[in-house]
Amino acid sequence: MAINTHYDHIGVQARKESAKLIMSKIKSIVGDRPAVVTGDFNITEDNEAYSTMVNSEFKMNDAYHMTAHHTGAPYTFHDYCRISPLKAPKIDFIFVTPNVKVLQSHIERETPTKRISDHNPHWADLEF
Protein backbone atom coordinates (compact mmCIF):
# COMPACT_ATOMS: atom_id res chain seq x y z
CA MET A 1 0.00 0.00 0.00
CA ALA A 2 1.26 3.48 -0.83
CA ILE A 3 -0.04 6.55 0.97
CA ASN A 4 0.86 10.20 0.43
CA THR A 5 -0.06 12.96 2.87
CA HIS A 6 0.38 16.65 3.57
CA TYR A 7 0.03 17.61 7.23
CA ASP A 8 -1.25 21.00 8.32
CA HIS A 9 1.56 23.57 8.57
CA ILE A 10 0.02 25.65 11.37
CA GLY A 11 -1.83 23.41 13.84
CA VAL A 12 0.37 21.40 16.22
CA GLN A 13 -2.64 19.40 17.43
CA ALA A 14 -3.74 18.75 13.84
CA ARG A 15 -0.35 17.20 13.04
CA LYS A 16 -0.47 14.99 16.16
CA GLU A 17 -3.97 13.79 15.29
CA SER A 18 -3.02 13.26 11.63
CA ALA A 19 -0.18 10.95 12.68
CA LYS A 20 -2.48 8.98 14.99
CA LEU A 21 -5.14 8.68 12.30
CA ILE A 22 -2.72 7.53 9.60
CA MET A 23 -1.16 4.93 11.91
CA SER A 24 -4.59 3.62 12.92
CA LYS A 25 -5.77 3.36 9.30
CA ILE A 26 -2.58 1.67 8.13
CA LYS A 27 -2.73 -0.87 10.95
CA SER A 28 -6.35 -1.79 10.17
CA ILE A 29 -5.98 -1.86 6.37
CA VAL A 30 -2.45 -3.15 5.81
CA GLY A 31 -2.02 -5.75 8.53
CA ASP A 32 1.32 -7.45 7.92
CA ARG A 33 1.65 -6.40 4.27
CA PRO A 34 4.21 -3.80 3.12
CA ALA A 35 3.26 -0.13 3.26
CA VAL A 36 4.92 3.16 2.36
CA VAL A 37 3.80 6.58 3.65
CA THR A 38 5.31 9.65 2.01
CA GLY A 39 4.67 13.34 2.14
CA ASP A 40 5.17 16.80 3.51
CA PHE A 41 4.59 16.16 7.20
CA ASN A 42 5.51 19.71 8.30
CA ILE A 43 7.30 18.20 11.31
CA THR A 44 10.91 17.53 12.25
CA GLU A 45 12.32 14.41 13.85
CA ASP A 46 12.04 15.88 17.36
CA ASN A 47 8.26 16.36 16.98
CA GLU A 48 5.64 14.27 18.79
CA ALA A 49 3.90 13.44 15.50
CA TYR A 50 7.19 11.97 14.17
CA SER A 51 7.47 9.86 17.34
CA THR A 52 3.95 8.58 16.73
CA MET A 53 5.01 7.37 13.28
CA VAL A 54 8.16 5.58 14.41
CA ASN A 55 7.33 4.49 17.97
CA SER A 56 3.71 3.33 17.81
CA GLU A 57 2.62 -0.27 18.34
CA PHE A 58 2.34 -0.46 14.54
CA LYS A 59 5.78 0.91 13.77
CA MET A 60 7.01 2.65 10.63
CA ASN A 61 10.68 3.23 9.82
CA ASP A 62 12.08 6.48 8.45
CA ALA A 63 13.70 5.41 5.16
CA TYR A 64 16.38 8.08 5.54
CA HIS A 65 17.73 6.31 8.62
CA MET A 66 17.33 2.75 7.34
CA THR A 67 20.38 2.79 5.09
CA ALA A 68 23.96 3.95 5.25
CA HIS A 69 23.48 5.06 1.65
CA HIS A 70 21.43 8.21 2.16
CA THR A 71 22.87 10.88 -0.06
CA GLY A 72 22.23 14.47 -1.04
CA ALA A 73 20.98 17.26 1.17
CA PRO A 74 20.16 16.75 4.87
CA TYR A 75 17.08 18.99 4.53
CA THR A 76 13.94 19.04 2.38
CA PHE A 77 12.36 22.49 2.85
CA HIS A 78 14.19 25.53 1.49
CA ASP A 79 11.33 27.96 0.68
CA TYR A 80 12.57 28.53 -2.87
CA CYS A 81 16.18 28.86 -1.65
CA ARG A 82 15.25 31.65 0.80
CA ILE A 83 16.33 29.50 3.79
CA SER A 84 20.03 28.86 4.27
CA PRO A 85 21.00 25.18 3.92
CA LEU A 86 22.44 25.51 7.43
CA LYS A 87 18.98 26.33 8.83
CA ALA A 88 16.69 24.46 6.44
CA PRO A 89 14.64 21.67 8.06
CA LYS A 90 13.85 18.14 6.93
CA ILE A 91 10.04 18.01 7.03
CA ASP A 92 9.34 15.55 4.21
CA PHE A 93 9.63 11.86 4.96
CA ILE A 94 9.34 8.39 3.49
CA PHE A 95 8.12 5.95 6.12
CA VAL A 96 8.08 2.19 5.47
CA THR A 97 6.84 -0.82 7.39
CA PRO A 98 9.58 -3.07 8.84
CA ASN A 99 9.06 -5.65 6.06
CA VAL A 100 10.25 -3.14 3.42
CA LYS A 101 14.00 -2.99 2.82
CA VAL A 102 15.49 0.43 2.06
CA LEU A 103 18.36 0.14 -0.43
CA GLN A 104 19.06 3.85 -0.80
CA SER A 105 17.61 7.20 0.27
CA HIS A 106 18.38 10.49 -1.45
CA ILE A 107 17.35 14.14 -1.08
CA GLU A 108 18.08 16.26 -4.14
CA ARG A 109 19.91 19.54 -3.64
CA GLU A 110 18.02 22.46 -5.15
CA THR A 111 19.72 25.58 -6.42
CA PRO A 112 18.24 28.91 -7.57
CA THR A 113 18.60 27.75 -11.18
CA LYS A 114 17.45 24.16 -10.57
CA ARG A 115 14.27 23.92 -8.53
CA ILE A 116 10.79 22.59 -9.03
CA SER A 117 9.26 23.33 -5.62
CA ASP A 118 9.88 24.93 -2.25
CA HIS A 119 10.88 21.41 -1.13
CA ASN A 120 13.72 19.21 -2.29
CA PRO A 121 12.66 15.96 -3.96
CA HIS A 122 13.20 13.00 -1.63
CA TRP A 123 13.29 9.47 -3.02
CA ALA A 124 14.23 5.98 -1.92
CA ASP A 125 14.97 2.65 -3.60
CA LEU A 126 12.86 0.04 -1.82
CA GLU A 127 12.76 -3.74 -1.93
CA PHE A 128 9.51 -5.55 -1.19
Task: Identify the role of each PLM range.
Residues 1-16, 20:
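Metal-dependent phosphoester/phosphodiester hydrolase catalytic core
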Residues 1, 12, 28, 38, ...:
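Amphipathic, alpha-helical segments enriched in basic
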Residues 2-5, 22-50, 63, 95, ...:
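Active-site beta-strand/loop signature of hydrolases that rely on acidic residues for catalysis
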